[in-house]
Amino acid sequence: MNKQLPSTCGAPEHSLNRRAFLGGVGGFAGGLAGLDALGNPLLANQLEKRHKRVILLWMAGGLSQFESWDPKPGRKTGGPFRAIQTSVPGYRMSELMPMMASRVHKSAVIRSFSSPNTGHTGASVFALMSGDRQDTGTLRTPSLGCLLGRELSQPGLPDQVSFWNAAWPFSGGDKQHDFALFLGARYEPINIAHKLAPDGIQLPASLTDDDHRAREALREQLAARFQENRSGNATVASHGGSYQRVRGIMDIAGLFDVSREPLRIRERYGHSLFGQQALVARRLIEAGVPFVRLTDGWWDSHGENFEIHASKVPTLDRVMSALLEDLEQRGLLQDTLVVTFAEMGRTPQINAQRGRDHWGACWSVTLTGCGIKPGVIHGSTNADGTAVATDRVTAAQFFATIFQAVGIDHQKEYTSADGRPIRLTPYNTEPVRAVLA
């Protein structure tokens, strides 16, 4: 297990009581109803999206770009680790990531990501929900995962599953930045914290599956009568949908059981919880679940930054390379987009506690697989990593790139509950076309 190392963040959230992240069950997909795609452009677009999936590797707390994708060896900001040559000529990565360095020619790295918000909760909301929009109490946008789950949904499967291997250390938990909002509760994630599977998805020994299905059939009969004169009631529909979601997750309970995988596959991912959750993610993606988020925490290295990254980055390197290799070998990577992202990067300056603080001016993200041009190293920072040197990328542009990569029009417009138009990305946003295939 990774050694627990100190973090002395001065962010306002750190003054709140620390609580364990609470996992909940919610959000299953409906299917595309029998439609004839012949000659229909709208349906052709739906078919293009139908088998697309996204895995988000979320580095909670803020992975340091200096100790991963954008090292600055020999500079006062660089730290003690070497930079090593990668499989992309001229591009060097931290020595802590040798596995990814050997296969980064199959990924796209953006080294010029920039965000104005550097508080954990605010930055997470900014990154995961609003793109470059500042959400307010009257205008809020669904999270990236909820939007992708809605757009890529598959019949009988969860729209999104969200794993955590560490507690969100601020009041309110992850719920602060993973809302479906006007999309409806069915698109909210199944949240699984500190384990590999949701609780309570196995039938008790005293109840057979046939008995359970008979009870469900009776419940549906009674519910149909109740809904006869309430067909437009969203609350009633959501209540009925919750039963279907529970039944659906019970039907796929075996996907959460990694013991069904060959030992060599389990060993490839490693014994960390993050690694085993990544293996479950691959199983879910292979079955058609459209969006899985894997949250690895806690990267908030205000103290002992180099010790924390020396401990955690090799695990990320192993898990990420194993996941990408596994997806590729199974023929899944061409239809699966794998994203590494966080709420922020780390400061160039090294503080008195040998840590790096919050930093949004310039840091790194990656994209691999579906719709992405491999081997692209996009953007750059200056010699000390204190500013973007070329090709600044905003959160809105990054969102647009993700949507376009999986066949979703990033200019698509939804209507909120109060009738206001809300686009997937802000007006006048363009994707980063240099990384799109």
Give a label for each model feature.
Residues 2-437:
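Ligand-binding pockets and gating/stacking loops
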